Amino acid sequence: MTVKTRFAPSPTGYLHIGGVRTALFSWAFARHHKGEFLLRIEDTDLARSTAESVNIILDGMKWVGLNYDNADNVVYQTRRFDRYKEVIAELLEKGHAYYCYCSKEELEAMREKAEKEGTATYDRRWRPEAGKTLPEIPAGVQPVVRFKTPLDGVTRWADLVKGEISIPNEALDDLIIARSDGSPTYNFCVVVDDYDMGVTHVIRGDDHVNNTPKQINILKAIGATLPEYGHLPMILNEQGKKISKRSGDTVAITDFGAMGILPEAMLNYLARLGWAHGDDEFFTMEQFIEWFDLKDVSPSPSRMDLKKLYWINGEHIKITPNGKLAELVKPRLALRDIHETEKPALEDVLALVKDRAQDLNTLADECLYFYVKQTPTEADVQKHWDDEAAARMLRFAERLEGLEDWNAEAIHDLFKPFCDEEGIKMGKLGMPLRLAVCGTAKTPSVDAVLALIGKEEVLKRIRA
């Protein structure tokens, strides 16, 4: 059997990080088992689904690098209405579904009664049964189509995350599978799609647990082999509440990109939300695929921890090739009005500073003074700069100007003799030198920084 999983987002605004984690676990499960990972766009909500939202999903999947095996044949539910109608007709013909002519008022009365009695909402008055007389069909009413849910027994499944789950069928409604205008409903479309796509493992959020028995019963009615189900726990915010844009939480995957998070780090972090491999916190996707198993996913909710996300991101920045980092940092430097990054070469700059940043925006800031001297903070000036320091910098500039070989080692060799002559400690040279050349007291080794900026530019800045 070829393992087939799917990710089935609804294009109604943005790609949620909870959805990305679901996609990640589905993707990793398929890759671990040498199977297929498929994408389906559940766009039947015509009022909310837009082409722009579809592109947001596709762009988000591309950004995080979750490649799907049906890239040339992504399934869109709105293109499958004929297929849904075909299956509905089959269910009606075989007696697994029926027409219901209830009015909104009747359904509301049933709902109120069911709430009081704790029973299923719909009283099945239009359900055909042996020896039962159905009401007279009202004039001018377009019926819905309902599925005939089994009246006795239980629907059970061995959930790959939550364990054994069983729901008494008497607690389930005869759900509507086609509205009065003929359009199919969510739970029905999902079943037909999973069946036609050959999905073997449905991995999704645990907000779908209540949908599962309904979908299992429909699958049985159409004669399908049941997939296995795994329901993932919710991701909570740092306060332990449901993540919500309204609460100020970052929820869209694209927002994390704007925050300077690498896609590899985002996936690494999301993988650790609910799944563990011993004490391993930092790993590559190749390692994750090798290690991943749904049995290691906790059924309990996970809590966001932005500090940990940034730490993981910093670790990924350290191992990212400088050439790749340069392509990610250049646009951020352009936003800071730095467009020329050849002198010094940005890759060389990144090699020196990338250990100092946990996100790409901070990394871009760390590169600025290599190209343009920054304005020192008042605190740095008060602490490290005075007339004596200014005069000392001019004297040290003469030593620098005399260097024939401009490199970090040669620059470093000037420090001790100069400090001895001046009767100062290294801090009295290094800190003012950083301010004079870079405009900040916080830099890597000052000899390496000066070597990269270049002799002509260093002397110009000191003497400005």
Swiss-Prot record:
Main subcellular location of this protein, as a coarse class: cytoplasm
Annotated SUPFAM superfamilies: An anticodon-binding domain of class I aminoacyl-tRNA synthetases (SSF48163), Nucleotidylyl transferase (SSF52374)
Spans through the membrane: none
EC number: 6.1.1.17
Pfam family, one: Anticodon_2
Entry GO terms, CC: cytosol
Binding residue positions for ATP: K245
Matching InterPro entries: aa-tRNA-synth_I_cd-bd, aa-tRNA-synth_I_codon-bd_sub2, aa-tRNA-synth_I_CS, aa_tRNA-synth_I_cd-bd_sf, Glu-tRNA-ligase_bac/mito, Glu/Gln-tRNA-synth, Glu/Gln-tRNA-synth_Ib_cat-dom, GluQ/Sye
Residues spanned by motif 'HIGH' region: 9-19
Broadest EC class assigned to this enzyme: ligase
GO BP annotations listed: glutamyl-tRNA aminoacylation
Catalyzed reaction equations: tRNA(Glu) + L-glutamate + ATP = L-glutamyl-tRNA(Glu) + AMP + diphosphate
Keywords: Aminoacyl-tRNA synthetase, ATP-binding, Cytoplasm, Ligase, Nucleotide-binding, Protein biosynthesis
Subcellular location: Cytoplasm
Keyword presence, ATP-binding: yes
Motif ('KMSKS' region): 242-246
GO molecular function: ATP binding; glutamate-tRNA ligase activity; tRNA binding; zinc ion binding
Purpose of the protein: Catalyzes the attachment of glutamate to tRNA(Glu) in a two-step reaction: glutamate is first activated by ATP to form Glu-AMP and then transferred to the acceptor end of tRNA(Glu).
The protein's assembly and partners: Monomer.
Family: Belongs to the class-I aminoacyl-tRNA synthetase family. Glutamate--tRNA ligase type 1 subfamily.
Descriptive protein name: Glutamate--tRNA ligase
Organism from which the protein derives: Neisseria meningitidis serogroup A / serotype 4A (strain DSM 15465 / Z2491)
